[in-house]
């Protein structure tokens, strides 16, 4: 007689998360729970949270890569809101997607109107007519 509550030959394999099955880092289970609690629809399919999670992970990776490049260009090792702002506003598609989003402490893009710049002087040289 075995004297424990567990099974004698525990051949159960460890459970694999849906995130691991899909090869994702973001939590599929949490997104599924939020979709159910959010009353977006009466029923949520099993593939919907996986797809949404993969889209969110891709967008986050894209923004963080561009922000990391902006931080490196400014010789910084830490991404700050300014770097996020520069990354989003300099990318045409991300700027369109997040056009009406305000990033706190993001600042503005450096831009000087063309009419405010000093006029370019014509070169004096051999090419001028006499």
Curated annotation (Swiss-Prot):
The nucleosome is a histone octamer containing two molecules each of H2A, H2B, H3 and H4 assembled in one H3-H4 heterotetramer and two H2A-H2B heterodimers. The octamer wraps approximately 147 bp of DNA. The modification N-acetylserine is found at residue 2. One of its GO terms (biological process) is DNA repair. SUPFAM superfamilies: Histone-fold. InterPro entries: Histone-fold (IPR009072), Histone_H2A (IPR002119), Histone_H2A/H2B/H3 (IPR007125), Histone_H2A_C (IPR032454), Histone_H2A_CS (IPR032458). Keywords: Acetylation, Chromosome, DNA damage, DNA repair, DNA-binding, Methylation, Nucleosome core, Nucleus, Phosphoprotein. Residues 1-22 are annotated as: Disordered. Phosphorylated to form H2AS128ph (gamma-H2A) in response to DNA double-strand breaks (DSBs) generated by exogenous genotoxic agents and by stalled replication forks. Phosphorylation is dependent on the DNA damage checkpoint kinases MEC1/ATR and TEL1/ATM, spreads on either side of a detected DSB site and may mark the surrounding chromatin for recruitment of proteins required for DNA damage signaling and repair. Gamma-H2A is removed from the DNA prior to the strand invasion-primer extension step of the repair process and subsequently dephosphorylated. Belongs to the histone H2A family. Core component of nucleosome which plays a central role in DNA double strand break (DSB) repair. Nucleosomes wrap and compact DNA into chromatin, limiting DNA accessibility to the cellular machineries which require DNA as a template. Histones thereby play a central role in transcription regulation, DNA repair, DNA replication and chromosomal stability. DNA accessibility is regulated via a complex set of post-translational modifications of histones, also called histone code, and nucleosome remodeling. It is found in: Nucleus; Chromosome. One of its GO terms (cellular component) is nucleosome. This is Histone H2A.1. It holds the Pfam family Histone. The modification N5-methylglutamine is found at residue 105. The lineage of its organism: Eukaryota, Fungi, Dikarya, Ascomycota, Saccharomycotina. The modification N6-acetyllysine is found at residues 5, 7. The modification Phosphoserine is found at residue 127. In contrast to vertebrates and insects, its C-terminus is not monoubiquitinated. GO terms for molecular function: DNA binding; protein heterodimerization activity; structural constituent of chromatin. The [ST]-Q motif constitutes a recognition sequence for kinases from the PI3/PI4-kinase family. A motif ([ST]-Q motif) lies at residues 127-128.
